Structures are given as structure tokens and as C-alpha cells.
Design a protein with these regions (language model features):
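Short beta->alpha junction loops
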Residues: 33-39
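The conserved SAM/SAH-binding core of class I Rossmann-like methyltransferase domains
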Residues: 9, 34, 107
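Catalytic nucleophile-elbow at a beta strand-turn-alpha helix junction centered on a G-D-S/GDSL motif
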Residues: 2-19, 40, 69
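Alpha-helical cap/lid subdomain in secreted, periplasmic
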Residues: 2, 24-30, 43-195
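Short beta->alpha junction loops/turns
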Residues: 11-14, 37, 169, 176
Length: 195
């Protein structure tokens, strides 16, 4: 029996929870992670063709946003402004729906602890921006009929300061493992339905 093929697209948060997700799904799916940090939505859009390769993906679980909402105080600018981010997510969804027959699952942007993050980085991230960018992406994906795995809500429910490292954005080892299991729990029934 061949397992469904699942592709995980995302940034360093995805990179750290991918091993736990793959391990938890090992008896129902073949899980792969894109070879690079997906970065911002502009980068994701530019690399979809490379990452999805020859196709054959049954499920694509995707996210971007933490890089988009980085604010540079010297330039007084976001890496990708909110309106451009929303447009990019719309393009990503349209591309995936046009070029693949995969079940699509959007993962929301995880929280930040801004006082921790902004004390140690030259650029800023704010939770209010996480909420705004999440809202923009959710408008797009819900309108397109894409399923949503709400990782933001999961981290909030588990305790932001317990799951996130002192850098204010990345997950602790336990946090990454918990996220991986959450993703696997969401994807498992989808994968079982495809076998």
C-alpha cells in the first residue's frame, strides 16, 4: 500500500516541528519538508514550482507570515506590507489550486513574545501584526475553501511563554514536538481518507 504524500511548506517554525509530525504520521503518510526555509510570502510564491517538483503531492500543508511581518525601524517598513502579504497568499493559493490536485491545509502564524524578541533583534515583531496578518490570510484561505490548522490558537492554549524560546519567536524543543503532534493530529484523518 502506498501512503499519501504530504509536503510541508513553511519557515523555521515548520522546520523544527516537521520531524515530530513526520514521525507521528509514519504509518499513514510519507511526509517531506521543503529543502529551505520558506521565508516570506514573496519567496514562497517564487519557489512553489521548485518545491512541488514533479507533483504527485496528495496534501500540501503551508504557512508563511513571520518573515513578512518583520518591521525595520530604520526603514519604517515591513518586510512585506500587509496588503502585499494578503495578495501573495491569494496567489499562492491560486497557484496550488491550479497546478495541483492536493488537499490544501493552511497553518496560522504562531505567536511572538515581543518584549523578548524585540530586546534581542535589530528588527521588530509585534503580536498585533501576527493577529492582523493571520486575519488577512484567513480571509483568503477560507474564501478559497482551504482547510485551516490553527497553530496560533494551539500555542496560546498551551501557554505562549511555555512554548516559545527566549528569542520570542522560535519554539522550545518541547514546543516544537507539541506543534508537530498537533499538525499530525490534524493531518492524520485527511491522510487516512486518501488511502
Amino acid at each position: 500500500m502506498s501512503f499519501p504524500k504530504v509536503l510541508l511548506i513553511g519557515d523555521s517554525i515548520t522546520q523544527t516541528y516537521a520531524p515530530a509530525a513526520a514521525e507521528a504520521l509514519r504509518e499513514v503518510a510519507h511526509v517531506e519538508l521543503i529543502p529551505d526555509n520558506g521565508g516570506d510570502s514573496t519567496n514562497v510564491l517564487a519557489h512553489l514550482g521548485d518545491w512541488l517538483g514533479g507533483g504527485g503531492w496528495d496534501v500540501v500543508h503551508f504557512n508563511c507570515g513571520l518573515h513578512d511581518l518583520k518591521f525595520d525601524p530604520e526603514k519604517d517598513a515591513y518586510q512585506v506590507p500587509l496588503e502585499a502579504y494578503e495578495a501573495n497568499v491569494r496567489e499562492v493559493v491560486a497557484w496550488l489550486q491550479r497546478e495541483t490536485s492536493a488537499r490544501l491545509v493552511w497553518a496560522t502564524i504562531t505567536p511572538v513574545v515581543e518584549e523578548w524578541h524585540n530586546a534581542c533583534k535589530p528588527f521588530l515583531r509585534h503580536e498585533r501584526d501576527v493577529e492582523a496578518y493571520n486575519a488577512a490570510a484567513l480571509r483568503v484561505v477560507r474564501a478559497a475553501g482551504v482547510e485551516v490548522g490553527d497553530l496560533h490558537a494551539f500555542v496560546v492554549e498551551r501557554g505562549v511563554r511555555q512554548m516559545i524560546c527566549p528569542d520570542g519567536v522560535h519554539m522550545t524543543e518541547d514546543g516544537s514536538r507539541a506543534l508537530g503532534h498537533e499538525v499530525a493530529g490534524f493531518l492524520e484523518p485527511i491522510c487516512r481518507a486518501l488511502t
